[in-house]
């Protein structure tokens, strides 16, 4: 089945979407500096429910018009404002291992990035188009895929995206209206 946005339209291959939580208490997905990072290299969920986050380009290497559940995907932030020091950082998402919070979703150049891809899977069969993000390692059978969930930083409450054994982050997709930016 095609992955549908919050208006019921299939996601376009290469389209730009806000990735929003199904729980309105939190905002969308964006990049932020965590730990001792000087640039926003960590993919996080905004704690401001009015913040839709950064538009994310969702693309599949397959020559298809629309994204279907289970397609291998690349996720990449559309351009966003950063301080001069951080201009030019690659914005494609990757999963980096050996971090205190576990395998975490990052952007930028990461020599510890795991070879793999993301995919989108539906979480419920109701009228709400609720999905989860999944990360699969390159050699993956299905059991080598992990749901993308949230790890909450005990120091400052930052909500980092991580490959999780616990509850997946349930999301919806909202098409970025380029005209309104």
Curated annotation (Swiss-Prot):
The keyword Mitochondrion does not apply. It holds the Pfam family Kunitz_legume. InterPro entries: Kunitz_inhibitor_STI-like_sf, Prot_inh_Kunz-lg. The record marks 63-64 as: Reactive bond for trypsin. Keywords: Disulfide bond, Protease inhibitor, Serine protease inhibitor. PANTHER family: KUNITZ TRYPSIN INHIBITOR 2, TRYPSIN INHIBITOR A. This is Trypsin inhibitor B.
């Amino acid at each position: 089945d095609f992955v549908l946005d919050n208006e019921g339209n299939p996601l376009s291959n290469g389209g730009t979407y806000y990735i929003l939580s199904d729980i309105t208490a939190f905002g969308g997905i964006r990049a932020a500096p965590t730990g001792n990072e000087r640039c926003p290299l960590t993919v996080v969920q905004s704690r401001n429910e009015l913040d839709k986050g950064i538009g994310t380009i969702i693309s599949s290497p397959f020559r298809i018009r629309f994204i279907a559940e289970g397609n291998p995907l690349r996720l990449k932030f559309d351009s966003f404002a950063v301080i001069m020091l951080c201009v030019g950082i690659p914005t494609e998402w990757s999963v980096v291992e050996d971090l205190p919070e576990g395998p975490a979703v990052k952007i930028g150049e990461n020599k510890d990035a795991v070879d793999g891809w993301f995919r989108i899977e539906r979480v419920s069969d109701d009228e709400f188009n609720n999905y989860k993000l999944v990360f699969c390692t390159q050699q993956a059978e299905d059991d080598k895929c992990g749901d993308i969930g949230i790890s909450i930083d005990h120091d400052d409450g930052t909500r980092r995206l991580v490959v999780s054994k616990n509850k997946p982050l349930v999301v919806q997709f909202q098409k970025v209206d380029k005209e309104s930016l």
